[in-house]
Regions:
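The feature marks the mature, well-folded catalytic cores of soluble enzymes
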Residues: 1-344
């Protein structure tokens, strides 16, 4: 088991003076979620692409390997530079391309083969599992609904692997082409097909998925309809959401900072979880984004981070809070991983 402890200097902590006639303000402090930052799927993707670059030279992921701008910039200095397509990568002189951690449809392998370039696959195995499950549901005759963001590369990849027009991405019922329950009739009524299966983008909020699924189920099951829900939200995403809930309940935080790239879906979900619990929550990429107005009435600040956020960025945010008079978490920020030491 590898334990990495990030120590945050206490320089800049404000001294609080009091006397017999003055009521001390409670100590301002930072608390951190038990689970935050890099997940094993992200670490695996970074390992693969950096190893490939080290062995064979420059490589172009089709998109961002992970959704974190600091990491993408560091990879660029190591010969890993994103491209929008295989054709673009070839035009810029790359002879190797990579599938990002979010996955791609089968067309990318075909394009790479046609262009005569090597293809390196960093797809998270949990995303691959969703892709295969989508294929299975379609083979079994289900209309596939992917709960997620239609623009997200993972969702696009799942629909591409389903290989059918009988698949759609949706985040709310109104995104679907149906507006009535099975068995209902009348002008303008569009009912679901008899069999509907649901999978989820791996980085979604489990509570929101269940609400969506229950509402859709009520539309499908009348008149002998079949509904199947496959909760494919990944364990690291769920762990980070549950850890944040525990932090809010245990430490009575006044403010939450969810750290991660602005493209990071799972970081956005963390901010949503905090706001849903009645705590002001902000999604930030860098410590420079912290606004003094946020801290005006915040005694306890909770910190969490998405699955693609490197340790040093978390450290920088906690350090910025320390410079504003917040006591860092006791013992630093503890990251425990049984089989991996982060590269960044």
């Amino acid at each position: 088991m590898v334990t990495a402890i990030i120590d945050v200097p206490r320089e800049g902590l404000a001294a609080v003076e009091s006397d017999a006639t003055t009521t001390e303000r409670p100590q301002r402090r930072v608390v951190v979620a038990e689970e935050l930052g890099y997940c094993w799927g992200v670490r695996r993707a970074l390992d693969i692409v950096q190893d490939a670059a080290g062995r064979g030279g420059p490589i172009a992921p089709i998109g961002d390997v992970i959704h974190n701008p600091q990491v993408v910039e560091r990879l660029r200095s190591r010969g890993v530079e994103g491209a929008g397509s295989v054709d673009e990568a070839v035009g810029r002189g790359f002879r190797r391309v990579a599938i990002t951690a979010h996955g791609m449809g089968p067309h990318l392998a075909e394009q790479a083969s046609s262009a005569g370039v090597e293809l390196v696959d960093t797809t998270c195995p949990l995303v691959t599992k969703v892709q295969r499950l989508a294929q299975k549901l379609v083979r079994q005759g289900y209309f596939l609904v992917v709960y997620g963001d239609s623009y997200h590369p993972e969702v696009k990849s799942v629909i591409a692997w389903a290989g059918t027009s009988k698949a759609i991405a949706a985040k709310k019922i109104s995104d679907l082409p149906w507006n009535a329950k099975r068995g209902e009739s009348g002008e303008g009524k569009i009912v679901p097909p008899r069999k509907v299966g649901v999978v989820s983008q791996t980085t979604k909020n489990v509570d929101e998925l269940m609400k969506f699924a229950m509402e859709l189920q009520s539309m499908v099951v009348p008149e002998g309809g079949e509904f199947r829900l496959c909760n494919t939200i990944c364990e690291p995403t769920s762990e980070r959401q549950h850890a944040l809930k525990r932090l809010v309940e245990r430490d009575h935080v006044d403010l939450i900072l969810a750290i991660g790239g602005k493209k990071s879906s799972n970081t956005a979900r963390l901010a949503e979880v905090g706001n849903s619990m009645g705590v002001r929550s902000y999604h930030i990429e860098r410590p420079e984004e912290i606004e003094d107005a946020w801290l005006a009435e915040a005694t306890t600040v909770g910190v969490t981070a998405g699955a693609s956020t490197p340790d040093d960025v978390i450290e920088d945010v906690v350090g910025a809070l320390a410079a504003r008079g917040y006591a860092p978490p006791e013992g630093g920020i503890r990251h425990i991983d049984p089989d991996y030491v982060p590269a960044f």
